[in-house]
Amino acid sequence: MSDEARTAEQLAQDYTAMGHSVDLINGVIDGSQMADESAEDRQGAVDRNVEHLELMVAKTDWGSEDMTAANSAITAGKAYTAS
């Protein structure tokens, strides 16, 4: 994504996508998502979504959006090791 400021619509879409990443990370960790996938696939999904959240949280054009769930998922995802 470029350094240009995002529109309100883009911010809303990005925030929604962040919620999907949070849900996936938490779901993989609690076993409710990707349970039938290999440990490598689960780990890869968590790692990619953690990276996505880190990039998005670091953006400076957010307004009053609450990043608590994203930051919690980043922490949980970094601690996760698929087995």
Name what the model sees in each region.
Residues M1-T7, A79-S83:
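Short intrinsically disordered terminal tails
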Residues D3-A35:
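N-terminal acidic leader/helix
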Residues Q10, E37, D41, S72-T75:
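Short stretches within intrinsically disordered, low-complexity N-terminal or propeptide regions
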Residues D14-I25, D41-L53:
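Short amphipathic alpha-helical heptad-repeat segments
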Residues N26-I29, V57, K78-A82:
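A structural signal for well-ordered alpha-helices, especially hydrophobic packing surfaces
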Residues D30-G44, A58-T68:
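Charged, low-complexity interaction regions
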Residues S32-Q33, V50, E54, D61, ...:
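N-terminal regions of proteins, emphasizing targeting and processing segments when present
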Residues W62-S83:
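Repeat-associated, polar segments at repeat-unit boundaries in modular proteins
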